[in-house]
């Protein structure tokens, strides 16, 4: 297996959840993080565009403003979502792998992999290498 390197300060943790409870754990993690660290930014990666939209709706339902970014959104909306997140207007970005490639996001405090990517190891590393 090819050796991969991540950022030295990266703290990686895994929480395996039953699929039917995944969203409840996600909400609890996001709400707790925002309560303890209100200025922290969070990216939630999802496997599909549909799941990304649903998680964005879930965040809105629990009172967490978020930006949603995936390939099915028009470019203008993607640009607007990314700008809102980068400027701090929203502290949560819900995205597919479209956000793990080549975007310049200077400070992300928490990356949550809502659904494990198809090529797990490589995708997770790309998502964490800002």
Locations of the language-model features?
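Conserved helicase RecA-like core
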Residues: 1-130
């Amino acid at each position: 297996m090819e050796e991969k390197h991540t950022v030295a300060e990266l703290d990686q943790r895994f929480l395996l959840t039953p699929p039917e409870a995944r969203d409840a754990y996600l909400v609890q993690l996001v709400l707790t993080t925002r309560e303890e660290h209100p200025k922290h930014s969070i990216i939630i990666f999802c496997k599909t565009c549909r799941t990304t939209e649903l998680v964005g709706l879930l965040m809105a339902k629990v009172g967490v403003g978020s930006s949603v970014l995936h390939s099915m959104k028009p470019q203008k909306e993607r640009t607007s979502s990314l700008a809102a997140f980068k400027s701090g207007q929203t502290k949560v970005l819900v995205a597919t792998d479209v956000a793990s490639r080549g975007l310049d996001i200077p400070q992300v405090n928490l990356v949550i992999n809502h659904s494990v990517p198809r090529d797990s190891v490589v995708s997770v590393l790309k998502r964490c290498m800002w």
